[in-house]
Structure formats: C-alpha cells, structure tokens
Amino acid sequence: MFYSEAILSKKGPLAKVWLAAHWEKKLSKVQTLHTSIEQSVHAIVTEETAPMALRLSGQLMLGVVRIYSRKARYLLEDCTEALMRLKMSFQPGQVDMIEPATALQSLKGKDAVTQSANLTLPETITEFDLLVPDSTFDFQWSQLLRTPSRSSNTLELHSLPISSSPSFPSSQLSIEAGRNAQVESGFSLGESFAHVGNDMQFHLPISNSGAATPRSVHSDNQSQISIEVGRDAPAAAATDLSGIIGPQMTKSPASSVTHFSTPSMLPIGGTSLDDELLAPVDDLNLDLGLDDLLGDEQGANAPAIEADEQAETSSIHLPSDIMEDDSSRPAAAGVEEGQVVESATAPQQEKINPQKTVRRQRAIIDPVTELSSKQMKKQLADTSSITSPLCLNTSSIVFNATVNFTRNGKFNTSIFSSNLNPKVNELLQADFKQAILRKRKNESPEEVEPAKHQRTDTSTENQETAEVLDPEEIAAAELANITEAAIATLPQETVVQPEGEAPELGSPMGFPVTALESADDSLFDAPPVMLDEADLLGSERLDSSVSEALPSSQTAKDSLRNKWDPYTEGEKVSFQTLSAGCNREEAVQLFFDVLVLATKDVISVKQDVAIQNEITLTAKRGMLLSSL
C-alpha cells in the first residue's frame, strides 16, 4: 500500500498522527504536545493532500484519539503535581529556606524589590530571652488584669475569687513569653526563688511555710507547672526564705519600709512583698533617724494612699474568659494536692491499661463423626433417595424439530427471506441434489450399450410411454392408487427368511404385503437374453418406485415422532390412536412408517386378535435416540 508524502513526511499536520496510530511509543512528550489536533482533523476531513481510503482515514483518526488521550494524561499529571505542591506549602511548620550562597548567586541581575523580598533576618532570640522577666515591685492589679481588647467586662472587687492568685484559662498561656508582653499573673517570691534554684542548681533549704503560695498561673484543680519547667514534671514546693534570710523575717515589722515606694498589691502569705524584703533593715539597729521621717510621711500621706488604693481596686477589668472560668469553677477551691495528682494521672493510667480482647467462641464439634456399619448397609441396600429413573430421551420436541427441519424442507424458509426468487429457492432446496442424482440414474441406461441378443417383438408403445412419463410421476401415481381395497387384494405369499435375520412382518400377522413382495421373482432370475431394453427399463423403474413408496428409516421415524414422541423405553400406544383424524392417504403412509421402523428394531408391533385386531406399538431404545 502506497501512502502520500504528506503522511510519511516528518513535518505537517498528518506526520505525527500517522506515527501515533502505528508506533505510539516512539512519540515523545514534546512531539505529542506540539501536535495540533485541530489542524490534523481539518486535514483528514477536507482531504487537502490526496484522497484517502476509508481504512487510511480511520487509522489517522485513531492516531488523533491517541494524541488527545496522551495530552489529557499529561495535563492531569501537571495539575496533580501543582495541587500537591500547594498542599505541601501550606502545611503547618513548613518553611522553605534557601541557602545563603545559592540565594546570592540566583538573585544577581534581579531588581531590588525581589531581592528584599527573598532576604531573611537573622535569628537574634537567644535562650536568655525566653526566661522569666524580672519582677518589679510596683505592679498594680489594674496593670495585671487590664485587657485592652475586652475592656467592657468589669468586675467588682467583692466578686473576685478568694484564691491567692488570679485565674487564667490554659488556652491563653504560652511557655515562651515575649519581651514586651504584659505579665499575665502575679508571681510569688517563693516561686521565683524556686526557679532560680532549679535553673542554677543551688541546693537551698527551701521548705513550705504556713503561707499559701501559688504554684502556677492557673486556678484549676490540676497540677500545673510554671514557665521553663517540663509539662509533666512534679510540682515545685512552695518556697519560704525564713531559713535563708533569718528567723526575724517571719515576725511582722514595727515600721515598714514600703513607704519608700508605691505600696505593692501582690499578696504573699499573710504579709506583703515589701515587708518581707525590707524586714531585715529594721533589725540592723542602725540609728539613721529615718523612723521619724517615715512616720511623718506615713501619717501625712496615709489617707491619700488609701484613697488611691480604693480607686484602683474598686473597678477591675477582666476578660470574659476569666469570668466564665470563675463562674464554672466548683465552690470547693481548697482541694488537696494528692487528689489533684490522682485526677491528673487517671487518664494516663486508662491509656496504659490495654483493653481486654473478646474471646472468640469455639466451634462446636458434632458428637457423631462416623457412620455406623448398619447405616451404611441400609444406604447401600436402599438407593431410592439418591437415584432417579433413567430417561434416555433427553432431547425435547424443539430440539428434534431443529435437527430435522432440513429434512422437512423448511430450511430455506427459516434462513432466507420470503421474497427470494423461486428459481433460486429451488436450487437451495435440500432435496435438489437427490433429484439430480435420481435423474442421472434414470438417464444412465441410455448410455449403456444395448445387449447383443434383443427380442424382435419389442413394442413401440411401451417405449413411447416410458419416454413420456417421468419416474417421479410414476412413483406418485402408484402411491396414490394404493387404497385399502388394493391392499386387501394384494397376493399374500409366504416368504422364507434365512436364518439369523429378523422375521418379516407379513401376512401371518394380518399386515398387507408390499409391492416389492408381490413382484414376480422370475423377472429378476431370467437370463439377460430374455429381457429387452423396455423390460430392463421397466424393472429399474419398478425398483425406484418401490423404494420411493417405502420411506427411509429416519424419515419414517421423524414422521412418527410428529404424532408420538415417547419419553421412556416400553411406552405403548395403539395404531388407531395415532391414525385418528387422518385421511386415507395419511393412514397408509403412517402404516408404511410403522412397518419400516419395525424392521429396524426401533419399535415392536403386536396385533391382538381378541380386541378387534388392535395393533399396539411399543417404543424401544432406538426410538428414544435422536438419530438412527
């Protein structure tokens, strides 16, 4: 097959299309993406290059479909890759940092805006910036509890919780505190020293005092840990500086030095922070003359200081989260630490304890696992439950009709259309070949040389009659002339059967004798010189007419099956029942079918003289089979 130059060329709208239709694997991704489907389809439809056959255009369309499929697959892969990159870029904690050396090299030649956008600041936050901020002694409640974003929620002083430290929800706390972040709660002095002892590894004799010091900025019942301490670490003990500073720290000072600065509102135990820090100054026994000065300042400024304190603490702004936390907190605030620890470790113990696996039920074993010998013998003796009656006639009526419809001449009507030419339908008949063979057989004696000795008294009338009549017409006429009266008048002769052959069903049983039996045997036994050409032709016609009068075994069986289709061997039916509703010719033909099948041992025939010579037919094994 020759292709045009447009198809076999390396360039053009049809170059890659033809290659994709035959060798798709040889096309690369670039060649596939650069192929224009619109131009290729336009070239195929319009046939600009050369007229193409239907097969060639179909192959080119196949190539177009394959190129389109590969383009769609490439597009899907690109979209999937882009989507995965977007998902990976938005993952929490994923930052794509570029290397410094490669960044400077890649940024050469770009504008200043792109360079400034890609620059990153160095990390200047160190470990020392994450420590607890230094405590100042001039904190006020208004500074600690004021929230700018939620200033509308006001809380009166009498509605504050009784706890020694304010309560904050755990969601507002962070382990790492910012540099300029506001202090979210008050810190006790003992707690601050406890952290110093833990961080600097100072073995200080810190013990619990009677003062209740807060261990955390939370107020819930669970054990919470301060900043820079492990989440699940044991609770730090409350600190008391009485052992370090001296026993004089515990006694309340006569004159407080807190008047040097603004009074602190952070409660630590029963005393204030300033009193505990500056208490040793009173015990130094130094007569500096400051008592009078402090006494005068205290006496003069005492009412003003108390008024300022009342103004600051009368209206305190708290976030709404604190209000909800305080309202939902149980009334019993003084819970022992042992109960808190148990409640905190209870969920962990539940997680550690494995769940009990449900045991599967064991399979129940049958008590009887073997059959007894008596039961086995009983089953062998009685097999009615496992056997069924033998039915050799497995073929149905529809199957038999399908197998034998060619013999009935219905093959053409079921295969070809009804408007077929009659002459063509005649040629397609199943018996057309048989008719040709019979015609050749009848014409063959004319070609044979005549006998040497011929009789001189041959009559021309017999020859003219033989030439005019057709063998088929003769057989049909002889079959039509057979009537009951003709059958009764046929001569009945006793035929001697050789040994080993089946007995012929002749006149002893009352059956009529066929034309073959009534023919004169002298015609066949006479020497050839006694027969002329007309007699020889007449004998052959007689043989053919008799053979046509007697149906074949399969035809007789099929004809009988149309009226009687037994299912089991030994099934019986009477001839009067089969011939009921038949005319005279059909009854004679049915009788001949019965005779033929009886000679082939397909059925057995019996005539009962006691019951008005009734003929009974019994089916044998051959009748149950589909073919003989």
Swiss-Prot record:
Q: How is it modified after translation?
A: Hyperphosphorylated during S and G2 phases.
List the transmembrane segments. Answer: none
Indicate where the modification Phosphoserine is found in the sequence.
Answer: 219, 547, 553
One Pfam family per UniProt: Rad21_Rec8
Consequence recorded when altering residue 231 to E: Sister chromatid separation blocked
User: Which terms are listed as keywords in the entry?
Assistant: Cell cycle, Cell division, Centromere, Chromosome, Chromosome partition, DNA damage, DNA repair, Mitosis, Nucleus, Phosphoprotein
Instruction: Show the InterPro entries listed in the entry.
Output: Rad21/Rec8-like, Rad21/Rec8_C_eu, Rad21_Rec8_N, ScpA-like_C, WH_DNA-bd_sf
GO BP of this protein: cell division; chromatin looping; DNA damage response; double-strand break repair; homologous chromosome segregation; mitotic sister chromatid cohesion; mitotic sister chromatid segregation; mitotic telomere tethering at nuclear periphery
Site (Cleavage) residue list: 179-180, 231-232
* Function per UniProt: Cleavable component of the cohesin complex, involved in chromosome cohesion during cell cycle. The cohesin complex is required for the cohesion of sister chromatids after DNA replication. The cohesin complex apparently forms a large proteinaceous ring within which sister chromatids can be trapped. At metaphase-anaphase transition, this protein is cleaved by cut1 and dissociates from chromatin, allowing sister chromatids to segregate. Also involved in the DNA double-strand-break (DSB) repair system.
User: Subunit structure, per the record?
Assistant: Cohesin complexes are composed of the psm1/smc1 and psm3/smc3 heterodimer attached via their hinge domain, rad21/scc1 which link them, and psc3/scc3, which interacts with rad21. Interacts with ssl3.
Protein name in the entry = Cohesin subunit rad21
Organism, by scientific name, is Schizosaccharomyces pombe (strain 972 / ATCC 24843)
